[in-house]
Amino acid sequence: MSGILDLLNSDLGKSIVSGVAGQTNQPENKTQDVLTMALPVLMSAMKRNASTPEGAQGLLGAINSKHDGSILDNLGGLFSGGVDSNVLDDGSKILGHVLGGKQQNVENALSAKSGMDAGSISQILKVAAPILMGVLGSQAKQQNVNSPSGLDGLLGGLLKGNSPQHEQSFLESILDADGDGSVIDDVAGMVLGGNKKKGGLGGLLGGLFGGKN
């Protein structure tokens, strides 16, 4: 299975990057950088949330109904004239559910790493979240996923299927390192415990997430 980051290099991914960049008035290369960092974090957070029976059922319900992948069938229509406010509202709800109280920390980390302001990061994530759910719904349909165990395998495959040359693969291993606690706390603990690249994303995440809540 192709990973979520491999998607960004596909024709569909290029359409997503181009559309999100146009919607947020940001350069495509910077938008791609942000999405390359953000998508594994969001996907890992979804995987963590789906590790409980209630979380898995909630996610299954969402991708079997509203987020069935149909959003991917008309990306041109989605982005032409600006993304509909209903889609952005949906994105806000998805982010709130997936990241909870850590959303601002994630946005600040992505902002500091990419050099893009946090407001633009927030807009990118709001547009990307419903599309990511659509990708998940589409993959679930293709693989006939209809159980929590199947969902866990799907999410794990999308994370672990990423090409090894992607520098963001370290993020996925960090996020998967601990079975309990929040995704962001896992990141902080790992990078604070062995932060060899002070100037890199590890140092950034450690600084932003290392303090008390």
Give the ranges of each region predicted by the language model.
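A structural "flexibility-hinge" signal
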Residues: 1-213
